[in-house]
UniProtKB/Swiss-Prot annotation:
HAMAP family: GMP_synthase (MF_00344). Transmembrane segments: none annotated. Its EC number is 6.3.5.2. PROSITE patterns: GATASE_TYPE_1 (PS51273), GMPS_ATP_PPASE (PS51553). Residues 28-218 form the Glutamine amidotransferase type-1 domain. Pathway: Purine metabolism; GMP biosynthesis; GMP from XMP (L-Gln route): step 1/1. This is GMP synthase [glutamine-hydrolyzing]. PANTHER family: GMP SYNTHASE [GLUTAMINE-HYDROLYZING] (PTHR11922:SF2), GMP SYNTHASE-RELATED (PTHR11922). Homodimer. Pfam families: GATase, GMP_synt_C. It comes from Rippkaea orientalis (strain PCC 8801 / RF-1) (Cyanothece sp. (strain PCC 8801)). The keyword ATP-binding applies.
Length: 542
């Protein structure tokens, strides 16, 4: 998505009435998901070419695909073997739709098998980097250099191709690393062009999108803003909309977009549960209410939330109680401020994919979801609230939301704000949450952010924060023995939060942060640095 947007300041401004789906999806590519960890990444790579894409279940019927009228289809990878009885299979009729198809890894093997070829267990699997030797540099492999590094992850190989298919490329261990049926525009690659490790992978994807599928780059921020405002106005009309504002980039971008569309018919409610970072509640109200004249209903519920967590040490219980209390407060305040017809939610496309149940159990072929930790998105939806939903961001990935926010005038400090969990500091305090421990952590966390900002390094990190442990350590301050809390520093780098590395922070910066914390934060006498990546750890401690 590009980031140029015309000014839209009048909620009654007339815009074209073409529906958003028809306008934005007229050059759509579909990814059929067979359980690959990279399916979302494929969609993002396509969208980076400014062409719209969606991830659908492999169970999607041929009629449903026809109705979408895609310019092309991509079959994702997956953990199964196509010759297993329970391996996920798509409708083989898709190969007769007359649209270009690209099979990736498992997707290529499935194409080969369903069209009469043969797939067998490889004598030697390929995992990691491999050199791609090109036999036919046309079509799919145009501008992909011979010998390029590609990322492999397969234990099966195609041993016999269907009639009409040619080999485009091979590796040292795989004779069919890329294949094509040029007449039918069916292509397959045994590697993963979507991952950053595949040099030339982006060129391959662009070849498929632009030259083979004949798409044009129309998926832009400008188009999305216009279409979204048009859709919001058509759906909401003159009805009232309630939005639970958290201060994060998702809800803030949504607030700006809705305010452009419906003006004062939007009510933003900010529930201060007492677990935000130092100065954030005040700054949030200042930005929205004072600077951009978007009224915010501020609800101070700090005491209520703290009382709910008294004596609680289990992290999942914390999350559940915070979510439950949020719903209680939200219900009470919406009743007081209402009535409302619509509830706005900052649902993003990964949430839509996840709720569509697109994971495959490699043993059974059944769709499953694995719980790592419960997530808290402003407490979740109250089930008994009789609101209609409006979710303008449900088509977007996180990076697209940031581009959108920047395009519609959201301040950079919000657009590039580090991700912050819904339960806030409550899950960065290991053990019981008390007012005293909140103050300790809030002050220490402020110093971390203050120092990296002074060094111009804030945006070098995906996240940078402090954690308070439920233990004490012995120290010496002013020739006296101390027995106080240790603070853990957690600074990490990441592209999308799915994986993360601990940041190699300059020692002098760590020293400055440590010195400030032990000298300025009462109750702390030790600072340690977390050097655990994700995996095996998670970004948050709870």
């Amino acid at each position: 998505m590009t980031t140029q947007t015309p000014p839209i300041t009048n909620p009654s401004e007339k815009l074209p009435t073409e529906p958003i789906n028809k306008a934005l999806n007229r050059q759509m590519l579909v990814i059929l998901d067979f359980g690959s960890q990279y399916s979302e990444l494929i969609a993002r790579r396509i969208r980076e070419t400014q062409v719209y894409s969606e991830v659908l279940s492999y169970r999607t019927t041929i009629e449903q695909i026809r109705q979408l009228n895609p310019r092309g289809i991509i079959l994702s990878g997956g953990p199964n073997s196509v010759y297993d009885n329970r391996a996920p299979q798509c409708d083989p009729e898709i190969f007769h739709l007359g649209v270009p198809i690209l099979g990736v890894c498992y997707g290529m093997q499935l194409m080969v098998q369903q069209l009469g070829g043969q797939v067998e267990r490889a004598k030697r699997g390929e995992y990691g980097k491999a050199s791609l030797f090109i036999d036919d540099p046309t079509d799919l492999l145009t501008n992909v250099e011979d010998g390029s590094t590609m990322w492999m992850s397969h234990g099966d190989s195609c041993t016999q191709l269907p009639e009409g298919f040619d080999i485009l490329a091979h590796t040292e261990n795989t004779s069919c690393a890329a294949i094509a049926h040029h007449q039918k525009k069916l292509f397959g690659v045994q590697f993963h062009p979507e991952v950053v490790h595949s040099v030339g992978g982006i060129a391959l994807i662009r070849n498929f999108v632009y030259h083979i599928c004949q798409c044009e780059p129309t998926w832009t921020t400008e188009a999305f803003v216009e279409e979204s405002i048009r859709e919001i106005r058509a759906k909401v009309g003159d009805k009232r909309v309630l939005l639970a504002l958290s201060g994060g980039v998702d809800s803030s971008t949504l607030a700006f977009l809705l305010h452009r569309a419906i003006g004062d018919n939007l009510t933003c409610m900010f529930i201060d549960q007492g677990f935000m970072r130092k100065g954030e509640p005040e700054r949030l109200v200042e930005i929205f209410d004072k600077q951009f004249h978007i009224p915010v209903e501020y609800v101070n519920a700090r005491t209520r939330f703290l009382e709910q967590l008294a004596g609680v040490t289990d992290p999942e219980t914390k999350r559940r109680l915070i979510g439950h209390e949020f719903i209680q407060v939200f219900e009470e305040e919406s009743e007081r401020l209402g009535p409302f017809d619509y509830l706005a939610q900052g649902t993003l496309y990964p949430d839509v994919i996840e709720s569509a149940d697109t994971n495959v159990d490699p043993q059974t072929g059944e769709r499953v979801a694995v719980k790592i930790k419960s997530h808290h998105n402003v407490g979740g939806l109250p089930k008994n609230l009789r609101f209609k939903l409006v979710e303008p961001l449900r088509k977007l990935f996180k990076d697209e939301v940031r581009k959108l926010g920047r395009a519609i005038g959201l301040p950079e400090e919000i657009v590039r704000r580090h991700p912050f969990p819904g339960p806030g500091l409550a899950i960065r305090i290991i053990g019981e949450v008390t007012a005293e421990r909140l103050n300790i952590l809030r002050d220490a966390d402020f110093i971390v952010r203050d120092e990296i900002s002074k060094q111009g390094m804030y945006h070098d990190f995906w996240q940078a924060f402090a954690v308070l442990l439920p233990v004490r350590s012995v120290g010496v301050m002013g020739d006296r023995r101390t027995y106080a809390h240790p603070i853990v520093l957690r600074l990490i780098t990441s592209e999308d939060g799915m994986t993360a590395d601990w940041a190699k922070v300059p020692y002098d910066l760590l020293e400055t942060i440590s010195n400030r914390i032990v000298n300025e934060v009462k109750g702390v006498n030790r600072v340690v640095y977390d050097i655990t990546s994700k995996p095996p750890g998670t970004i948050e401690w709870e």
